[in-house]
Curated annotation (Swiss-Prot):
This is Golgi-specific brefeldin A-resistance guanine nucleotide exchange factor 1 homolog. The lineage of its organism: Eukaryota, Metazoa, Ecdysozoa, Nematoda, Chromadorea. It is found in: Golgi apparatus, cis-Golgi network; Endoplasmic reticulum-Golgi intermediate compartment. It comes from Caenorhabditis elegans. Keywords: ER-Golgi transport, Golgi apparatus, Transport. The keyword Transport applies. SUPFAM superfamilies: ARM repeat, Sec7 domain. It holds the Pfam family TPR_28. The keyword Flavoprotein does not apply. Residues 221-230, 1451-1464 have a biased composition (Basic residues). InterPro entries: ARM-type_fold (IPR016024), GBF1-like_TPR (IPR056604), Mon2/Sec7/BIG1-like_HUS (IPR032691), Sec7_C_sf (IPR023394), Sec7_dom (IPR000904), Sec7_dom_sf (IPR035999). Guanine-nucleotide exchange factor (GEF) for members of the Arf family of small GTPases involved in trafficking in the early secretory pathway; its GEF activity initiates the coating of nascent vesicles via the localized generation of activated ARFs through replacement of GDP with GTP. Also, plays a role in receptor-mediated endocytosis in oocytes and endosomal trafficking. Involved in vesicle retrograde transport from the ERGIC and cis-Golgi compartments to the endoplasmic reticulum (ER). Plays a role in maintaining mitochondrial morphology, network organization and function. CDD domains: Sec7 (cd00171).
Length: 1975
């Protein structure tokens, strides 16, 4: 209250008095007494002033005191408008300033008097309507201020109703201005808002007469019999002053008249609407007041049902009374003339403040205003009623269900009116209706389940109806759009969609609301002409569901709950703010009265918009929901079947378990299923066979306390009464009996009930059947009574009862409403709806947010994705496209959350279509919206499938870019659940690969050969791009047209370049390589599906290509596609090495498929498959599991490749195996795996062919040998390492694996599509080097291959002819079936062997045999400097494969000259530069020689370390080692193969290799190295090692180096002789020793007869002499019978004089015992051999046929040596291999005599220093003399044979480069000679001094033999180095030291030589030209 309230009242009073005086002066004509004495209004103000002058505060006064003068003015009839307005303004000011204290006991009377006075305002109207409307506006202001002020809560219900009524009158008066009417509407809104906001503070007090009338059944029955009450007639007329021209009261009077006449129903004074309660409706006890005012949390249905009304006493149930109320706002009845005395009470009681009665009357009146059936309700009235209902619902809708007197109005009348209003075409009404429905169902859907269902069906029907009208050319689509907008708003209610699915779709007898609406939205989401907005709304509705589910999934992932924080409002009393609205005031009032304000959720961006309603306590489980859904589908099917045939329908349902076999379950189903046909029900239950069902059906009705006609009406509504009288009688009999029993037998007999029931049916027909009315008039009530007289067991029925029945039947016909139309049917259906709502079927469950999202998404994802796809396809608006893609992303996230794989696949497949990348294969950017993409701007790229065209089309298609970004985003985020979509994704990746848009991570793959370590798998397949315009006009024909050049026309424009750059940028941002990297995070199923998809895509490419190319190879594009897919599989496999068991089966199947013969014409693909297999194996062998074993075993797939393929891919295999073994040698543990690895090494490095090819080759050689004679063997054109190799590269280019097409076209070779067979040279096959040695021999013949083949054919003939005689001999051929190998692969395999065998670190019992076999094979392949090699190395191609793309400049430069050129990709090509070729050839010579020496070192090292290796294995307790550590095994499987390999290299054409091999062989045969061998092993050694070596050396293996050949033979003979003598005692004990000895004599004879330079002529006799002397001295001849005779007989044939010099006399028998011990003593005193070289490398070998030069003699000896060894039938003798330089050898003299020679030059052992026979100077002089003699002999040789030299030079065609090279080497040799001689001279001086200090007895017993040193030169530092002597500069001194050359790295020198019995010395034998035959 204002402190200056007295002055405020005084001021307002003065203002009103002034206006009254003014009015008095205007109308008073004569002077009268003072106005105060005559005017009561002025007198009241005078009294008020006196009172105010006496008080200090208004609080001390009664408010009625200072209000009454103003109120009198307001009610006065003779005051004008301004006076009344001033009085109203004063009252408003008093209220606004709070002058009336609400806590005062007099405040209630004060506000009541104000309300009455304002409602009954009277004034004299003015001339202008504006001034009158000002008074009316002030009335509205006072009414609003009064109700909204704090004292307003004291107003009575009647006062509030009158106030609202006054405002309604102003609103409905059309004569008033629009502004005033809108102000009245605003006032009504504020007042309505206040009243309903205060609803939580109201209580249902049954003591109130209004409440008692509604809830008391006794009053209900009494009121029915009373006269209907009339509403209060508010006084609108008064006596008019005669002098007032315009009556002030006419406005309100006219408004009242209008209300009474034109619109009585609007305010309803005389209209009474009675709403009967639904049948069988039982109300629950009212909730207590304490529960009502608890506003913090809503009252649940359970609480409401369990609570009891305060005024309900002990009653538990009350029948709901009829709501009998006036259409207008009711109040207490008073007379029109009586005025309310505010100081007195009505009826002796004080009026109660307004509450629920006022609230209900207002609600009822608003509902009445919205009734569309009432014609008096205009559109404006309906809109006003809807708006005020919206205000009420917005204010406090959540609390309306707490009041039982309000909910019936809402459930019945309000919902019925709203549903009827939805049929209107008036858009404002429709909009307001939808808004009201939204608020209603958002808050109270739990209590209106079926009303909500009806509303949703109504919206659906609106959309469908508008569609039909639009299709028929009807009006617009505004109603449809409003309906869709309403659906969107409903869908946005948190939890509503979930509840809809739960309560309707999962309800047995409700429609599938959610599914049907989803289909409807999908159908409307497709854009149509004029329906763009509707489609967007439909799409929004679909997306709302998707977004809600997605948000729920995200919140569950992040752990955010559903509890929304709530807080109460702060105490509004503390806020000194003015009242802005009734809502604020109501909140203040609620707090002031102790109530709590309604909860308001805190606005927070973090808290999820959860369901406002608490979840229901009895929520079904998910399993129950699933089962319910299944039952619903079965019931729907059974219902349809029942309507056709009831018997079949019931049988079906019973079969499915839906119905039991009892009648109760069947009857329950018949009663509760609203979809059943009423006639079908009657046909079933009226059948006499189903009497039990009929009986149970009748008993299911609640007939208790129900009048017979009402019960009969209820009964007949459930089925259609049959037409047969018998059936009717049957049904009526059962009905009457049940009703009679249920109502406690109200009649005297049951037949009375039957009769009365039948009479009611007849009465219904009589009253309503048109035919009956025409025949006779309808009966009256008296007739009806007479007809039933005496039927109640001879008594009459109650007349009043019969009258009521008659009246009910006459008024309302008993009909079958379901068969009716219009209002009858609608009323019945609505009544059924209300009845179902009151049963358990009407229970509505509130579900938590996201409770059943999975099922919802399963229902809507398909339609939603289809709609999104269509919208994205057809729309071009960026906003719509983004919305569609957002929907895709959210659907994908939901699918990933729930693991719905088919959903995610569908999304990805749709997006792949929109990327326009999946159909590029067909040559177009087709698919969806991009079919009309115009590429005409791309001048030459239009209609082209070139990479540039694809990139351009993609860069210009913004929609495709958006889809691509989304696609890759989804795959990166949720690839785990992708299944079928992988195929489409990889198809899109393939198109990007073809368009060259993929990043380097996917196109640059690992490679073993390329020096960079990677290659680019993208190749250029250029095609001529079509021109955009064909200049074929006349000017073009004359050359005047087409000014632009061809290059200008093909050049893309700047815009096109920008588009292609944009395309590349988009793909880069998509990060496609992340798919491979993230594959390790995929689930097992997804990963397996990914690999299967790639394999399926690969197979599809082949299937599509095969119909057109069944015989040809795949196109370049298809091959590249398969390569791309293969590299993806390999990369994914490497990323998932931890899950190799899962991945490997898929990878293996794919690799087996690619390595099959189907792809024999696709070398690029097969090569990458080989590399991929090796990469997988290399990365996964460290794992110790079965999969690693399987991976190793799978390498055997490479062995199944054809020999040609193995040759082509030998580099990759060799380099890959090298990396594999280096990294995983310790991880291979099984023998079979090592066998596979070494077999691959042999195949790659030595071209070891499969067995079938070997057999074929052998057969061909046998056939050739029969046709060609053996005399052509000398035509073999081999060369030694002193020759040049410049001519060997002739066929090099034809033998590379791949080349670019440009190179092929220039050379006229094969194209890129040629098969593997065409990748080898056309001169011959790869089956063996025997057929193609011409590539390594420079001939004068024009056809080198033909000449070489003839030479080899001649050699093969000799081999075959001699094979039959040497079947029992071993062979030095280490491996048969070798093909031509790749040099780079050979060298890499040698490195691999060196790694494995060096120091025997990786040698195990599992790989020992395989490694030896591989070592022997590489030795065979390394023979003669690479005679098996396919061609010289190609420069840097030795270490890398030229598979990378060449630079653009080179391409352009070459393209200028060769239009057919293409980039070099994945090709093995060599340069044609001559200088580079010569350098490569020289490098090849050095590399092959180096590898041969490495292989020798490996053989020697393994030979010497074998005992140590076995000892190490024995220490490791290896069972395999213990089984193998036997002498027989070591010899057979280790030593013998190694000695054969060393012996094989002893036949090499290169002098250095031969010398080193003989040195290693000599060391191997030292007694200490193989001391454990027995006689049988030594016999085998001769038969399988030494004798085959002697046989091989009989062939002219190095004709250009005759001296070298002779020296090799000499050293070999000496090794054989020495070996025989060292083990003579053991061998002599054998029975076969005579045969062995005779065979050795045969070899001596053959070597003596061979062409010789003189050395052999001296060496053979000396060796024979030594052996004879030793054998004679040891008594061998004496011990062996006839051995001496045979020896003498044999020697007499070729050296008879030797017998005389050595053993002229036969041995004596007694001599054997005395002399047999000397050789043993010699053996015992043998010295240890020098340590072997520490260097070890690896190499390979091949096989050659044997030459039978001395066939006759060897044949004779073969029978003697036959028992020594056995050899396979197909084992041949190797072909002749030329050697270069002769080597000297020590001659061992065991007898008493020795040849004359020089003393040793090296330091003797300390135990027995050598004795010098000559002085140092004499030694040096003798050496010089020998040198001069040798030089003289060489000059003589040149003089005697100039013609021979000329022929040799012409034959071998030495180039000038070779001649210069040889001269340079000779000069270097001479320099080395001089340096060596000077050092030797100093050495001799030191030896002389030592001899003088320590003299030695020359006859010392420690010296068992004499040594003759013919050559003063010592051993070279390493046997690998030798001089290369030109033919024109031959020298007799053939073996000198040569330092390492540039092409061969220096090796560690061997250990210094020492003089011993086994030390080698050189014997320089002068060259004797006379002994050399001419060639």
């Amino acid at each position: 209250m204002a402190t200056n309230g007295v002055y405020i009242v005084m001021g307002e009073a003065n203002c009103v008095v002034a206006l009254l005086n003014k009015a008095r002066r205007q109308y008073q004509l004569s002077q009268v007494p003072t106005l105060e004495d005559t005017d009561p209004l002025l007198r009241n103000f005078t009294d008020l002033k006196e009172v105010l002058n006496e008080v200090a505060d208004l609080a001390d006064m009664n408010p009625q005191t200072y209000l009454s003068p103003f109120l009198d003015v307001i009610k006065a009839q003779n005051t004008n408008g301004p006076i009344t307005e001033a009085a109203l303004a004063a009252v408003a000011k008093f209220l606004n300033y709070g002058l009336i204290d609400a806590s005062s006991i007099k405040a209630a009377n004060a506000v009541e008097s104000i309300a009455y006075a304002v409602v009954h305002t009277k004034f004299i109207g003015g001339k202008s309507t504006g001034s009158d409307e000002c008074v009316l506006f002030k009335i509205l202001q006072v009414l609003r201020s009064l109700l909204l002020s704090p004292p307003g809560i004291l107003l009575s219900n009647e006062a509030v109703c009158d106030m609202m009524q006054s405002c309604f009158r102003i609103v409905f008066e059309q004569n008033l201005s629009l502004l005033l009417r809108k102000a009245a509407e605003s006032t009504l809104a504020d007042m309505t808002q206040l009243i309903f906001t205060r609803l939580p503070t109201f209580v249902e007090d049954t003591r109130h007469p209004y409440i008692r009338q509604l809830v008391n059944p006794t009053e209900k029955r009494q009121k029915r019999k009373k006269k209907r009450q009339l509403s209060v007639h508010i006084e609108t007329k008064a006596k008019e002053p005669e002098n007032v021209p315009t009556e002030m009261t006419k406005l309100i009077g006219e408004a009242a008249e209008t209300a009474e006449t034109d619109g009585a129903a609007n305010l309803g004074y005389d209209v009474v609407l009675t709403t009967d309660p639904p049948v069988d409706t039982v109300t629950h006890p009212d909730p207590p007041i304490e529960e009502i005012i608890k506003l913090a949390e809503p009252i649940s249905a359970g609480d409401e049902a369990d609570s009891e009304s305060e005024g309900g006493g002990g009653e538990e149930h009350h029948e709901r009374p009829p709501v009998r109320a006036h259409a207008g706002l009711q109040r207490e009845i008073v007379s029109d003339e009586e005025e309310i005395d505010t100081e007195q009470t009505v009826g002796g009681e004080e009026k109660m403040p307004y509450g629920l009665p006022c609230c209900r009357e207002l609600l009822r009146f608003l509902i009445t205003m919205t009734n569309p059936v009432d014609r008096h309700n205009t559109e404006s009235m309906v809109i006003l009623g809807l708006n005020l209902l919206i205000v009420a619902l917005e204010a406090i809708a959540d609390f309306l269900p707490n009041y039982d007197i309000l909910m019936p109005l809402i459930k019945n009348e309000l919902c019925r009116n709203l549903l009827q209003l939805l049929d209107t075409n008036r858009l404002p009404v429709l909009a307001a209706t939808n808004r009201c429905c939204f608020l209603l169902f958002e808050s109270m859907r739990m209590h209106m389940k079926f009303q909500l269902e009806s509303y949703l069906k109504k919206l659906q029907s609106i959309v469908l109806t508008e569609e039909k009208q639009h299709e028929n050319g009807g009006g617009g689509t505004e109603q449809k759009e409003m309906a869709l907008e309403s659906l969107v708003q409903l869908w946005r209610i948190p939890g509503l969609v979930t509840e809809m699915y739960l309560n309707f779709d999962c309800d047995l007898y409700c429609g599938n609301i959610f599914e049907d609406l989803t289909k409807l939205l999908v159908e409307n989401s497709f854009p149509t002409v004029g329906g763009h907005t509707a489609s967007l709304l439909s799409l929004d509705a679909l997306l709302v569901v998707i977004e809600t589910i997605e948000q729920n999934c995200e919140d569950r992932e992040n752990g955010r709950g559903e509890v929304a924080k709530e807080q109460e409002h702060k105490d509004l009393k503390k806020l000194g703010l003015p009242v802005l609205s009734g809502y604020d005031l109501a909140k203040k009032m609620a707090i002031s009265t102790g109530g709590k304000a309604s909860p308001m959720p805190v606005s927070s961006s973090i808290v999820l918009r959860s369901n406002r309603h608490a979840p229901s306590t009895e929520l079904p489980s998910m399993s129950q929901i699933i089962e319910q859904k299944k039952r619903k589908r079965l019931i729907a099917e059974g219902t349809e079947l029942f309507n056709q045939s009831p018997k079949k329908g019931i049988a079906f349902l019973r079969e499915k378990g839906i119905l039991g076999h009892d009648e109760q379950s069947l009857v329950q189903w018949l009663r509760t299923n609203p979809q059943l046909d009423k006639k079908a029900i009657a046909d079933y239950i009226c059948n006499r066979k189903h009497a039990e069902v009929l009986n149970a059906f009748v008993k299911s009705f609640p007939f208790e306390n129900t009048r017979l006609d009402v019960a009969l009406r209820m009964f007949l509504e459930t089925f259609r009464l049959p037409g047969e009288s018998a059936e009717i009688a049957l049904v009526m009999q059962h009905f009457s009996e049940e009703w009679f029993r249920a109502n406690n037998e109200p009649f005297f007999h049951v037949d009375a009930a039957f009769t009365l029931s039948y009479a009611i049916i007849m009465l219904n027909v009589d009253q309503h059947n048109p035919q009956a009315k025409r025949s006779q008039p309808p009966m009256t009530v008296d007739c009806f009574r007479r007809n039933l007289s005496g039927t109640n067991d001879s008594r009459d029925f109650d007349p009043e009862m019969l009258a009521d029945m008659y009246q009910a039947i006459k008024t309302e016909e008993i009909v079958m409403p379901a068969e009716q139309k219009g209002t009858v049917k609608e009323d019945y259906m609505w009544k059924v709806l209300l009845r179902r709502g009151e049963t358990a079927e009407g229970s509505f469950y509130h579900a938590p947010t996201g409770w059943n999202d999975h099922d919802l998404f399963a229902v809507c994802w398909g339609p939603a994705v289809a709609a999104l796809s269509y919208v994205f396809d057809k729309s071009e608006h960026e906003q719509i496209l983004q919305k569609a893609l957002t929907g895709y992303r959210k659907c994908a996230k939901i699918a990933a959350y729930y693991g719905m794989k088919e959903v995610f696949d569908n999304l990805c497949i749709h997006l792949c279509k929109f990327t326009t990348l999946t159909s590029m294969r067909d040559g177009g950017a087709g698919g969806g919206a991009d079919e009309d993409v115009d590429l005409s701007a791309a001048a030459l790229l239009s209609h082209s499938s070139s990479p540039e065209a694809v990139a351009l089309a993609f860069g210009e298609n913004h929609k495709a870019q958006l889809a691509t970004r989304t696609l890759f985003y989804l795959v990166h985020e949720n690839g785990n659940i992708l299944r079928e979509g992988w195929r489409n994704l990889f198809e899109a990746l393939l198109q990007l690969f073809r368009a060259r848009l993929l990043p380097a991570e996917l196109t640059e793959v690992e490679d073993y050969v390329d020096e960079k370590g990677w290659v680019n798998i993208q190749r250029v397949h250029q095609k001529e791009l079509p021109h955009t315009r064909n200049d074929s006009g006349l000017l073009s024909w004359f050359g005047l047209g087409g000014g632009a050049s061809e290059a200008d026309r093909r050049k893309p424009t700047q815009e096109q370049l920008s588009s292609m750059k944009l395309a590349s940028q988009v793909i880069s941002e998509c990060r496609p390589s992340q798919i491979v990297a993230d594959s390790k995070y995929l689930t097992s199923t997804s990963l397996a599906e990914l690999l299967s998809s790639i394999a399926a895509n690969s197979a599809q490419i082949v299937e599509q290509a095969e119909p057109q190319q069944k015989t040809a190879s795949l196109s370049g594009e298809d091959e590249d596609a398969l390569v791309f897919y293969l590299e993806l599989i390999v990369a994914i496999t490497l990323e998932n090495k931890d899950r190799l068991p899962l991945v490997w089966p898929h990878v293996r199947r794919h690799l087996e498929w690619l390595l099959s013969p189907r792809f024999g014409r696709c070398p690029v693909l097969v090569e990458r498959a080989v590399v991929g297999l090796l990469r997988v194996a290399n990365r996964n062998l460290f794992r110790d599991n079965t999969v690693s074993d399987d991976v190793l075993h799978s390498l055997s797939m490479l062995l199944r490749l054809s020999p040609k393929a193995l040759f082509i891919f030998s580099r990759q295999i060799a380099f890959g195996l090298y990396e594999l073994i280096r990294a995983n040698a310790a991880n291979v543990h099984k023998k079979e795996h090592w066998a596979v690895l070494f077999a691959l090494l042999e195949a790659a490095g030595a071209a070891v062919l499969p067995d079938d090819y070997v057999m074929m080759t052998t057969t061909e050689k046998q056939q050739q040998s029969l046709r060609v004679g053996g005399d052509q063997q000398q035509q073999r054109m081999a060369y030694s390492d002193v020759e040049g190799a410049s001519g060997r590269g002739g066929g090099a280019h034809e033998e590379r694996a791949y080349t670019s097409e440009g190179e092929e076209r220039r050379r006229g070779g094969y194209d890129s599509n040629s098969d593997l067979e065409s990748r080898v040279d056309s001169a011959g096959s790869l089956l063996g080097a025997q057929k193609q040695p011409a590539d390594w021999i420079h001939l004068d013949h024009k056809d080198a291959a033909k000449a070489t083949e003839e030479a080899l054919t001649a050699l093969g003939a000799n081999v075959v002819s001699s094979k039959k005689n040497f079947r029992q001999f071993g062979s030095l051929v280490l491996r048969n079936g070798l093909g031509r190998h790749e040099p780079a692969a050979f060298l890499k395999v040698c490195e691999c062997l060196a790694f494995l065998l060096r120091d025997a670190v990786h040698v195990t019992p599992d790989n020992f045999e395989s490694s030896l076999q591989c070592l022997r094979t590489m030795v065979e392949a390394s023979l003669d400097g690479g005679v098996y090699a396919a061609g010289p190395l190609s420069g840097d191609a030795q270490n890398r494969l030229r598979s990378n793309v060449t630079d653009e400049k080179a391409v352009k430069k070459h393209h200028h000259h060769h239009h057919g050129h293409k980039k070099k990709e994945l090709c093995t090509d060599v340069t044609e530069d001559a200088d580079e070729s010569r350098n490569e050839e020289q490098q090849l010579i050095g590399n092959y020689q180096q590898m041969s020496l490495h292989l020798l070192d490996l053989c020697s090292q393994l030979h010497s370390q074998t005992p140590a290796i076995f000892a190490k294995w024995a220490q490791g307790a290896s069972p395999a080692a213990s089984d193998l550590a036997t002498v027989a095994f070591i010899w057979t499987d280790i030593w013998r193969p190694l000695l054969q390999a060393i012996g094989r290299l002893s036949c090499d054409c290169r002098r250095g290799v031969r010398a080193a091999a003989l040195t290693h062989l000599q060391r191997a045969f030292l007694p200490a190295n193989m001391a454990t061998l027995g006689a049988a092993e030594w016999q085998s050694c001769f038969g399988e090692v030494l004798f085959p070596l002697l046989t091989k050396l009989l062939e002219p293996f190095s004709q250009m180096d005759p001296i070298g050949m002779e020296d090799t033979r000499v050293r070999t003979l000496q090794i054989v002789a020495k070996t025989l003598l060292n083990h003579l005692s053991a061998l002599s004990a054998l029975d076969s020793f005579p045969d062995l000895w005779m065979l050795l004599l045969d070899y001596m004879e053959q070597y003596l007869r061979v062409d010789s330079c003189g050395n052999l002529n001296e060496a053979v006799p000396e060796s024979l002499k030594n052996m004879l002397l030793v054998m004679d001295s040891t008594g061998i001849f004496a011990a062996t019978p006839r051995l001496y005779d045979v020896t003498v007989e044999r020697l007499n044939k070729f050296m008879p004089e030797l017998i005389k010099d050595t053993i002229p006399n036969p041995p004596r028998p007694g001599q054997q015992q005395s002399e047999a011990s000397e050789p043993k003593k010699e053996h015992a005193s043998g010295l240890e051999p020098p340590p072997p070289s520490s260097n070890s490398t690896a190499a390979t070998s091949t096989s050659d046929p044997s030459i039978a030069t001395a066939q006759s003699s060897i044949s004779t000896a073969s029978s003697v040596v036959g028992p020594l060894v056995t050899c396979p039938e197909d084992a041949g003798i190797s072909a002749p291999i030329p050697i270069q330089h002769p080597l000297t050898e020590v001659i061992v003299h065991s007898g008493p005599t020795s040849p004359i020679g020089s003393p040793p030059q090296t330091e003797p052992p300390a135990s027995s220093p050598p004795q010098h026979q000559h002085s140092e100077h004499q030694q040096y002089e003798q050496y010089r003399q020998q040198q001069a003699a040798a030089a003289q002999q060489y000059q003589q040789y040149n003089q005697n044979y100039p013609q021979q030299q000329q022929q040799q030079q012409q034959q071998y065609a030495y180039s000038p480069e070779h001649a210069a090279y040889y001269q340079q080497q000779y000069a270097h040799q001479q320099q080395q000679y001089a340096e060596h001689y000077a050092n030797q001279y100093q050495h001799y001086q030191q030896q002389q001094q030592q001899q003088q200090q320590h003299p030695v007895n020359p006859t010392s017993p420690s010296v068992h033999g004499q040594y003759s040193v013919a050559n003063p030169l010592p051993l070279p530092a390493h046997p690998a180095y030798h001089p290369i002597v030109a033919p024109s500069v031959n020298s007799a001194f053939t073996h000198v030291y040569t330092p390492p050359q540039n092409n061969a790295p220096a090796l560690a020198p061997s250990a210094p030589t020492t003089t011993s019995a086994d030390s080698p010395y050189f014997t320089p034998i002068p060259y004797n030209p006379s002994q050399q035959e001419k060639p």
